Amino acid sequence: MNSGAMITLSVDAEAEQDRLKTTINWGNNTDVTYGGKLATVARFSKTKGRSPILQADIDILPTEVVLNDTLWNIRSSHVAIDSGRVYIDNFLFERPGQYLRVDGKITKEETDSCIVDLKNVDVQYVLDIVKFDDVEFGGLATGKVFLKNILNKPDMKTRLNVHNFAVNKGLMGEADIKGVWDNELPGIRLQADIEEKNLSSTRVTGYVSPKLKALDLRIEADSTNLDLLTPYFEGIFSELDARANGLVRLHGGFKTLDFEGGVRVKLDTKVDILNTYLQLHDDSVYIKHGEFALKNARLFDREGNSGRVTGALRHKHLKNLTYH
């Protein structure tokens, strides 16, 4: 969501004896609508004994939510809170052909678990939550996330398929993603295998840490689509059609990302300042902190004329590109 958007929020609460009915309404003022209502009825009680503990039984009522102009339904479900333990009974957030379902126990016990079940959920919804908005992701995720011991030493494993996985609107293919929570980071260690059928394959390994707001990913490219770089080259190149083979590391804070490594590139693109199209047929691009460099590379135009070039595109964390 646009960070400059205005969000309106209202909370209505009605208490009667040991019962509390709460309704939360929210909305925004942007061209794309985010808004809706969450309604609950909570009943409170205390355990018996010398040190009574507050317990809560919460009924989640059916309501509607709009995300990115799309209507979703919150279905009836139940949550119980008892002695620091949370029991979730079939929370369901859905629309035709898509859903997010949560069921299980959130406790300090190693034997208790919670399952998050996804079907065709837009991956950008998830990344919006952790404020990772410098890179735009797309695709529909299906699979399960298994959670254990959440309130003590979290244990998380996931296996997701992402249909039409895209980065900065550049289609990467079908993604098979495996993830495991690492308490030492803390963050998610992942392996993603991404394939465009009969075109390319890409393997990504490394970690993403929402807490540190940082990532470190090793990218093994085999004819990988480079459309994902289009936003960073705006004003210099346009109509980019490029694929790469090689090894690249993407690392840094979410706001201070950088690349290093080396790839061989096939490229056809318009150089805006020259108003002409240039090509690399299969040449090396050398990548280091703040720089993409060519060394005596052969460039072609679309008529087959060629010449040699040595130069570099320099940047500051993928912003403010200049060429030398």
Where would I find each of the regions flagged by the language model?
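Interface amphipathic segments
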Residues: 1-324
